[in-house]
């Protein structure tokens, strides 16, 4: 899972996509919201949107202070890779 970062207006923006079966998007979105709530004090903004372009996936964006960039990167990697390993998506449309 590749994370992209943009620095703008004194904030860091972390953007990544999680490719997951559309039938299980509810489960993945619940996990994204759970992650956001767990670390809400670190975030300024959170956006999630759904796409089927180039495969079924949810795109996620978090905004936070630049000094938290390394911590967020590690937490996103750890959290969502664990989720994908424990609950792989196996059913396309």
Place the predicted regions along the sequence by residue.
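An acidic, charge-biased composition feature
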Residues: 1-93
